[in-house]
Amino acid sequence: MTKRTFGGTSRKRKRVSGFRVRMRSHTGRRVIKSRRKRGRDRIAV
């Protein structure tokens, strides 16, 4: 059996790929737009 190596840190996740971070850049807004268009329940982390 292999160890589960992904710990996961909430603060780090939010800082990297949270909604407010996405809205800062043009490409981030494009991500939000495409996820809305696709009908994702979770737009950002």
Curated annotation (Swiss-Prot):
It comes from the Bacteria. Residues 1-45 are annotated as: Disordered. GO terms for biological process: translation. Keywords: Ribonucleoprotein, Ribosomal protein. The keyword Cell division does not apply. One of its GO terms (cellular component) is ribosome. GO terms for molecular function: structural constituent of ribosome. Residues 10-45 have a biased composition (Basic residues). The keyword Ribonucleoprotein applies. Pfam families: Ribosomal_L34 (PF00468). InterPro entries: Ribosomal_bL34, Ribosomal_bL34_CS. HAMAP family: Ribosomal_bL34. Belongs to the bacterial ribosomal protein bL34 family. NCBIfam families: rpmH_bact (TIGR01030). This is Large ribosomal subunit protein bL34. It comes from Prochlorococcus marinus (strain MIT 9515). The gene is rpmH.
